[in-house]
Amino acid sequence: MIRYPNGIKAGIRPSQKALSIDLAPTLLDLAGTAPGNEFHGVSLRPLLEGTSADWRSSFLVEYYSDTVFERIFKMGYKAVRTENYKYIQYVNLENMNELYDLAADPYELRNVIRDSGYADIVTKMQIELQRLLDATS
């Protein structure tokens, strides 16, 4: 939620996905300062002003737990989310990866990773996950 009466109309609700990492670049942009390269987020200002339709098509999610509980510790994962799909790759568990078709299954109840009809999507999501990991490492 951002309130800026001099630059953003009240009630704006962009449909694009915003991330917490976008907050600092947005505030810097609104203050008239360009964010540095150390920021992985992007300014939401164009979306809030209604001037940009070009936006990220995917984003990276990573989770690593502590070592208190061995089973939970082994559940670290890296994931990529697009508008229609979520691909999850577990760090320490083999053959446990997941793919969800969010358009058909918004509650993520059916893992379609082994469904042959999704083989091309799995490959694309794996490539996109690696691209995002390379971009943020």
Q: Where are the regions that the model predicts?
A:
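Glycine-rich "substrate-gating" loop/helix at the edge of Rossmann-like oxidoreductase active sites
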Residues: 13-18
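The feature captures the short pre-catalytic strand/loop hairpin that immediately precedes
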Residues: 1-9
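Intrinsically disordered, low-complexity polar regions and short flexible loop motifs
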Residues: 105
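Phosphate-coordinating loops and pocket residues in cytosolic domains that bind phosphorylated ligands
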Residues: 114
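C-terminal cap/loop subdomain of S1 sulfatases and analogous C-terminal strand-loop tails that border
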Residues: 8-10, 21-24, 29-98, 102, ...
